[in-house]
Amino acid sequence: MSNKFVVIDLETTGNLPKKGDKIIQFGAVVIENGIITERYSSLINPQKSIPAFIEELTGINDEMVKDAPLFAEITEKVISLLDGAYFVAHNVLFDLSFLQEELIQAGLEGFYGSVLDTVEMARFLFPTADGYKLTDLAEKENLQHDRPHQADSDAQVTAELFLILLERLSSLPLVTLRQLTHLSGGLKSDLQQMLGEIMANKDMNTEELPDAIEIYRNLALKKLTPLVDNKEADKIDFQYPSKEEEKIEVVNQGFEFFEKRTGQFRMMDTVYQAFQNDKHTLIEAGTGVGKSLGYLLPAACFSKQTKVPIVVSTHTIQLQEQLLKKEIPLLEKILPFKINSVLLKGRSHYLSLEKFSQTLMDENDNYDSTLTKMQILVWLTETETGDKDELNLSSGGFIYWNKIKNEAPIFSQKDMWQEKDFYQKAKRDAQAADIIITNHSLLLSDIKGEGSILPAFDYVILDEGHHLEKVASQFFGHSLDYLSARLMIGQFGLYEQKQLFYEMEGLLAAIPRQKGKLLHTFELNQMVIDLTYEMDEFFKLIAVYAKAKQTNKKGFNRIKVRFSHGDSGKERNALVHSAERVAFLLKDLHSAIIDRLESIKTAKGTLTAAKENKLEELYIFGAELAELRNTVIKCFLKESKDVKWIEMDTRSPQNITTFLAQPAFVADQLKEKFFQVKKAVVITSATLTVNHSYSYIMKELGLNADATVQQSIPSPFEYKNQVQLFIPEDLPAINSVSLDEYVIAITEHIITIAEATKGRMLLLFTAYDMLKKTYELIKESGFLNEYVLIAQGITSGSRTRLTRNFQRYDKAILLGTSSFWEGVDIPGEDLSCLVIVRLPFSSPEEPLTEAKCQIISEQGGNAFSEYSLPEAILRFKQGFGRLIRTEKDRGLMIVFDRRIVTTKYGKAFLKSIPSVPVKNGTINELVELIHSWL
């Protein structure tokens, strides 16, 4: 193997060398025997103008390159650098394609040596990294990266990253390296020779495995540490600290500088009493109360004293991770006993080692499957949970995960991986746990009586409890979407596509045939063709129905259309007939597959482990097919009280639609199946009350006011001194103008405000279409070119990634919709200005909103005051909560929607947030306020 690596980075005028794009900067770092021995960089004259966006990205302009050499003038140097070396780059095919083109144009041979891609290597060697951009990886590994998108800086950082990747590769167990080598032929990177040398080195020096690693059935795994159930053995001489001075003494041990929070102590007592007295309890705790510790401390004390588990359920993964990794360790510092805690998820979140080990033998892999297998091989040396949420999977990786996820076996089989199984370990740990952390959906699966991972429990804390009603509605409902249905049928495939169908026929061919009973392969193949066609037509007809019934003519691209059983139009009739045909074909295909599987099963004793696993996979596919048919019938062919609707983007191909069915209200189900069977449920959130009353949330959840404790704990922050609320007078009333006119008016204000605040601004929208139009208009205006605009749904990345990027830049503006109204935590000066573009009422055309309002009106109620207004107020409170995250923050909140002061109900919004100074005025007065306040 060559011990010389040349790490190259290029800046270019665009992405297409064959279409005339050129190199404008060349950077190279040479590594020999693990040490950087040379650096070389040069600007290049591209002999064409550098586009404005490239200049903005790289900082390189026409003036800087006009006297630089042509690429042809540095080819001799480039060739000497690459002589006998590996070509290494971050996304190697991009840099290589430009280099080849330039070398060929200079009359030379291209580079035909070995290549290594650091993106690809990082994907499998850092399987849990947040992202694989160079900036993300540099941040992860604490590498100095001051000048991204400059070739010399990028090449240096890529070289440092490459050395770290080599070190990680060398540290892997020999058995893992052998498996990676076997798979590496399917990659872009030429890894085999290098892996061979690393393995030879390990062979020669007789490998010593780290203590934390074990080899089991030819897989290197991290040793798992089971939770030890000490409930019966524990003799804890510790009482709950009921007095304030006792709490101070206990909590003080966890903090270097402890500041007493009276609200937090009140919360502790309320939670402890709820469990002691078996009382359902609602606690609204304002920002800064210290909610997590406020419920965890009494929960831990109660659990230890009574030897019963407490289930803590949250809505977001982010909060679950925070509880497990930050709050529980803090709790263990301040309490004199060990707390057994476990994070539980649904079964399909856990890897099946049995299935994974079998798929390692499959030969017909695509690129994504190969890379995901390599990712998982490395991850198995690190993970203690086998939870897929730890992994950063590609979209193709998620498809592969479906083959290896943990599922209940359809027919009994001997599982040789039982003692190492991640799901079984999670179940065992749950039995030993004092505190079980989970999510609302898994909590509800316990209600539904689905084989839950949760042990028996009577005491629950629901954090982010305002989400429970929405999660329950989704949980008790059904959904059908084109991509999932198509993917499922695609997994089975046609015979010639060599997917599950082909593999099933292979199993069948190996056993004696039962004459006349089974369909011919050709007939089954035709059935799959018919079903695929009918499924396409079915989803096209869903789209036709949606477009025909669409009443929203405001130019929105994303539409939601209610599907009514009372409708007798031709579009509905065509759709129902299509659903009947799909259900019929699904039934036939399911029966034909099960007949075949039952035949194969008769020879079960003669099947190898691999064939038995394939049979299991086929049975699971059959169950999924039956479930799909069941959903089609429930959604289209059976009368039900569920609200049914269609969601689609009018710009997408016409069959890419989603059909949903959900109950309008879930209060009765929650009351009967949850609140009446649990001894004490504590529901907490920063947003439970409307106008200081809990009646709305209690009605939504089916709670009895007389039997429920209600406790409000205000935030310790001094909002009067920390926040100013401003309402511009010179904007049009939102319902008096068209969407486009309103967007033009607010965009002018946004530009003026941004220039005054120097960015540091979060804009909250209620609809994506308005966000998109505003973003495009700001961009077109050119007034904010020096600001970084980050927009949900436009800028790529998760909410966490977008928030992090917003905090990274001095002059940044973040535009968000639904999920940004809550759960975004941007403390300090990073966020100084919050703009609420319109009051967050759900559209009356939103199917669930329309159905709820209809039912309330039919029952003689007032839909606006009983549902639409309280729901909007809770969302408004969540939005307000984004601005002030610590006692030192200061900020300005601007509400563009003048209904907050021009309508009677507007006052209810202002009453529901802490008391702050409210000012009305023109944009000029607002700018003056910004300068004096911020």
Regions found by a protein language model. Name each.
Residues 408-431, 444, 450-451, 586-731, ...:
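A contiguous, basic/glycine-rich beta-loop/short-helix subdomain that forms a polymer-engagement track
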Residues 222, 241, 245-249, 313-433, ...:
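A substrate-engagement module of RecA-like helicase motors
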Residues 1-114, 127-149:
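Conserved non-catalytic scaffold segment of RNase H-like nuclease domains
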Residues 277-298:
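Walker A/P-loop
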